[in-house]
Amino acid sequence: MNTSEREPLLDTTTRNRVYDTTDNPSTKIMKREKDNPKAKTTSFNQGKLNIGEETCDLYAYKETIGRQILFWLLTIVTLGFYQLLAYWVKSLFVKVRFQPTSHDECEYVMVEDIHGTQTIKEVFKAESDVGLARPTRSGKQEKVKVMRFFTYRKIKYIWYEKDQEWLNPADMDSAAPFNIYQKLTLDVIGLKEQDVIASRKIYNMNALALALTPILVILFKEVLGPFYLFQCFSVALWYSDNYAYYASVIVIITVGSAAVAVYQMRAQEKRIRNMVGDTISVIVRRDGHDITIDASEIVPMDILILPSNTFILPCDCLLMNGTVIVNEAMLTGESVPVTKASLKEADECGPEIRLSSEHNRHTLFSGTTVLQTRNYKGQPVMARVIRTGFSTLKGQLVRSIMYPKPQEKEALKDVMVFILVLGFIALIGFIYTVIEMVSRGESLKHIIIRSLDIITIVVPPALPAAMSVGIINANSRLKKKKIFCTSPTTVNVCGLINVACFDKTGTLTEDGLDFNCLKAIRKNEDGKPEFTSEFEELDPVKLSAENANLNIVVAAASCHSLTRIDGTLHGDPLELILVEKSKWIIEEAVNSDEETQDFDTVQPTVLRPPPEQATYHPENNEYSVIKQHPFNSALQRMSVIISTPSEHSAHDMMVFTKGSPEMIASLCIPDTIPEDYMEVVDEYAQRGFRLIAVASKAVHLNFAKALKTPRDIMESELEFLGLIVMENRLKDVTLSVINELSVANIRCVMVTGDNLLTAMSVARECGIIRPTKKAFLITHSKTEKDPLGRTKLFIKESVSSSENDIDTDSEVRAFDRKAVLRTATYQMAIAGPTYSVITHEYPELVDRITAMCDVYARMAPDQKAQLIGALQEIGAKVSMCGDGANDCAALKAAHAGISLSQAEASIAAPFTSNVPDIRCVPTVIKEGRCALVTSYAVSKYMAAYSLNEFLSVMLLYNDGTNISDGQFLYIDLVLITLVALFLGNTEASRKLSGIPPPRRLATSAFYFSVFGQMFFNIITQTTGYLLVRGQSWYVPNPEELDNTTTMIGTTVFFTSCCMYLGYAFVYSKGHPYRRSVFTNWLLCGIIFVIGAINMVMIFTNMGFLMNLMGFVYVPSTSMRFILLAISLAGVFLSLLYEHFFVEKVVAIHFESYLRQRRLRNGDPSLSAYEKILAAIGSSPRWFEDEINLSKSIDRKETIESKC
């Protein structure tokens, strides 16, 4: 096949929508251009880069000699400081280093994503005299002599001059019509060598190449952070001032924290690389020959020969012939084998049809496991490669893990603001010190060192390390509870969680379904059908006793898609349970060659009842399944054709169909359905049971006609046989955990792939739908449109478990674009297809629907991640708990992803629980709250300590003296380091409080606390200072003595030491997020020991201690008691101030007042989530002012709503 005739295939590469195989990519491209007028280049060097549904800004640059000289000149003049700033701020780098230019001739591009992350990439050129064939949207190839490209986040982007866009070649393949793929099934020759070479220049290798970043590079990036550099500056200053001991301690702490950070990054890289796995050898057909190559050498449009043994697919491909049974657990999270059909069985379609989810039954996805292949004798099973490398399904998953959404920068911003405030104070002290020392005639070196020393005192270099103490302790406690964290910084974020999302199956409920009962059909005295009583077994004896139709047993044993692989039945656990309950015997071909190669002959599965049931099937003890119509989610059913030959006819056959109660009822003859059918169905559904309706009909056809008769004809005019009731039990802890979270005002949300009815039932059972609230279902009509041509939406009431689940009698009204529900005393539920309609056609409703819906059913994996993103967009702090690989994208997107799995999901999530239930969620939140408030407390403690020490130094500088090195060392190393180290050792509260912790560090309560303590410091130290100076026995420091060994310095030291210890109690608040400080026996022990040492220093006159600390003996014992009393009074006032004024008045009343005022004024700093909830909660009839429409909905007095 000639390269120019290649017709490449579709790609659905996204980052936010990792598993998106539902949308037409070419439509997405056109939609983006239509919706975004800036999709084209808006200025000569600015453009847009489309990555799935994310649009990044793109800027084009080139190098010039003059700008390079300017760049290096600035670097030299600033002693490298400019280079450092340019490293932190990429835009500053490109403004000096590069010259803006057009994209047609650029040498570099800067990509800025929607989160503001900037990345500079070099543009490369590929040239060929014979021309390079690159894909186009039409599916054709166009030849160019020069191709310009760059690689961003593992994906190659090529410059298309005509379109004036950078495009991913795999995305361009996506525009090819689907009928092209169908035509390619006739080509079994494969690519020629020149085609392969040409493809490799366009597409990257089929390998998820993840080279480990060198440790030195990781370390270099880590230590170039502002905090690390400030620590280096401080340490250098201290060493130059002979303050070596504390400097060495800071060095040890800094090196340790950097080592931990490097280790965590390297461990994460290794985990991702292990997930990718090694490459394998595969067989491809090229130029008519089957050759074995490494999987990394596969290119798009290769023909892959699928082996009959189990193996993992290395790429995405379309099945050309035969059938393949695959395990798509990596895609769907369900380990149920799926049968894939070849393209030859696909319906003929026109050029307007693109690859979509409707064609997934022909698509084999990378990372999924092939269990079995079947084809005609002597012919291999072949598949056409359509996506390779990071464009595949698995590649998208890996990229979503490698390039996650960055954590919110609010906390870092608050810390920086706080440091700037301290820096301003330090600047005042710096100026004062310079003026004071110049006036005293100090040397220039002394002035510089002492002035800079003020900065290191006020802005503590150990602040980042101290703030991480709570995180380290929380991680340690989580590990003891078998919860493992790969991203420690996420722990603090967990303390802010206010929305907890859960998958259903395997997370809230047990993994599998259990058989509950059977309700068969019998004829009553009037000959009308009615339900029998419940049967706990598929027992013909008991069924016969009630004159039930025994065909329901045959249906349970035969109507399934189970497959025998290596002698063992594999398939849907539900079907395995039914076959086991029936006790029937299933016989298939026993030889592997027979299993996989005799696909061209009719080789039916044979079913036999057990010997003890033979008397109940006298006419036929052997049944043959001659055809299977697999389950189709759109049709909501599956069916089989069973040959039941008798002595009267060899053409007797039965069709058995099972599916959803609604669908099966619509296919049955009405006279065969009991009158109370819907009442019975609703009764079971609202109790959380999964119902399977079963029906049958007899047909008289020969084998050939039976195989060719259309499915819709075979599945019509059925006789209803009964209902099979399956139970998906809640896990033991689910109800208590959901209740604990709800009581703590943490919103619980179910996000599941199950149907809406079952999801609502389970949600009510576990407490997500609260019994005190009404619930409403948002649905849509596939056929009805509103006046604007959009899909029509509807709202129904779902009532309590004591009534029917869906109120079908209530008035159902259209849901208009301006409609919103008016009361906070309700909850909502929605299915994935309806949610998709809203996001695409009613974008203005997305925020309110996202804020109010608590049950999301029929959600695809990409929709789960989309929902998490929508919740984050309105300002919610979201956790996601799931157990399947289909939850990976959502786990990674959430602020706190918690995996209950050890597979792919555990790699995507920062938390993994070895206890497979949701009790880990409140545990993580409690530990997160504890770590968060500990970080706040340590921040305030370090700030109070710094300001305390700053005041001491300022007082002593005024007296021409300073704190001695021994005193500095005791304060910094013993008082502060030890206390800060154990301050975070207080455990989390056992109860999850209903009051959330402060969302930000920089609150009014924080600053009132820090500066209030500063005020008490000033009073305490100044009082002691003035008292001692006013005594008759006070002797000023002689000029010939060291100016750090003074009586006034000793006095200031004594008074400040008590304040340091007092802060440990002031900032060790327990309730409601931590346990009492007295449970932290290590901290209490440290405080007791240090307090005793302080008493010894104040009241004794030991020579070695006086010399070591630089003390001057205070001759008056009464004055020492007075100094102690002043210090204790200061501590007591600090405690009262913090407890009563800061925590009661400021944190509660003043903060509440500010919050209410911001809500009234529509402050943009408040999240949309808060505004929506506040509006609904404060005014139950708020919508009437906007819509001026209300109407009571039927007898149940449901909500008044403009629909």
From Swiss-Prot:
Gene3D superfamilies: Calcium-transporting ATPase, cytoplasmic domain N, Calcium-transporting ATPase, cytoplasmic transduction domain A, HAD superfamily/HAD-like. Its EC number is 7.2.2.-. InterPro entries: ATPase_P-typ_cyto_dom_N, ATPase_P-typ_P_site, ATPase_P-typ_TM_dom_sf, ATPase_P-typ_transduc_dom_A_sf, HAD-like_sf, HAD_sf, P-type_TPase_V, P5A-ATPase_N. GO terms for biological process: intracellular calcium ion homeostasis; polyamine transmembrane transport. Disruption phenotype: Disrupts the polyamine uptake and/or transport of the polyamine conjugate Ant-4,4 and norspermidine, a toxic structural analog of the polyamine spermidine. Intracellular levels of the natural polyamines spermidine and putrescine are as wild-type. Double knockout with either odc-1 or smd-1 (two enzymes involved in polyamine synthesis) results in a reduced brood size, delayed postembryonic development and reduced intracellular levels of spermidine. Residues 90-209, 264-297, 436-451, 957-962, 1029-1046, 1107-1120 are extracellular. It catalyses: ATP + H2O = ADP + phosphate + H(+). Pfam families: Cation_ATPase, E1-E2_ATPase, P5-ATPase. One of its GO terms (molecular function) is ATP binding. Its main location: membrane. It is a multi-pass membrane protein. It comes from the Eukaryota. The chain crosses the membrane at residues 69-89, 210-230, 243-263, 298-318, 415-435, 452-472, 936-956, 963-983, 1008-1028, 1047-1067, 1086-1106, 1121-1141. Residues 1-68, 231-242, 319-414, 473-935, 984-1007, 1068-1085, 1142-1203 are cytoplasmic. Keywords: ATP-binding, Cell membrane, Magnesium, Membrane, Metal-binding, Nucleotide-binding, Phosphoprotein, Translocase, Transmembrane, Transmembrane helix. Residues 21-42, 595-617 are annotated as: Disordered. It is an enzyme of class 7 (translocase). One of its GO terms (cellular component) is apical plasma membrane. Belongs to the cation transport ATPase (P-type) (TC 3.A.3) family. Type V subfamily. Involved in the uptake and/or transport of polyamines, probably through ATP hydrolysis. This contributes to the maintenance of intracellular polyamine levels. Polyamines are essential for cell proliferation and are implicated in cellular processes, ranging from DNA replication to apoptosis. This is Cation-transporting ATPase catp-5. It comes from Caenorhabditis elegans.
